[in-house]
Amino acid sequence: MKKLISILMLLMAFTMSSNAMSYEQARQQALFLTDKMAYELNLTNDQYEAAYEINLDYLMSVNTVDDLYGAYWRYRNLDMSYILLDWQYRAFCDAAYFYRPLYFNAGYWHFGIYARYPHRDYFYFDRPTVYI
């Protein structure tokens, strides 16, 4: 019985550590990521709004490690190719912290953008109008 309880507790701990992020977390991460995209890629207001929604949808869809580079990641990148100009999309793909914004290591989710922009409270632009 003790062994079963131990296994269940370990399974629950593993499941909780790899759970999807909350809506609030996804919203904050999408805002930070999109703000830096707007700064580096010189996005217009319409592109900024659309990129925020795309990033938020992607972050909300990631529930497991398998989702990182699965269908929603491909949809995200395809959507980005529709809203960005050719030179912007090439720059987007060349920057790993934009192209693959999220990774999972040692049981935790990590955002590559923070290696380039460590000040998490500094924003270049205002919030998008769709930011609720």
Name each model feature, range by range.
Residues M1-A26:
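Bacterial Sec-dependent N-terminal signal peptides
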Residues Y23-Y39, N45-I132:
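Low-complexity segments
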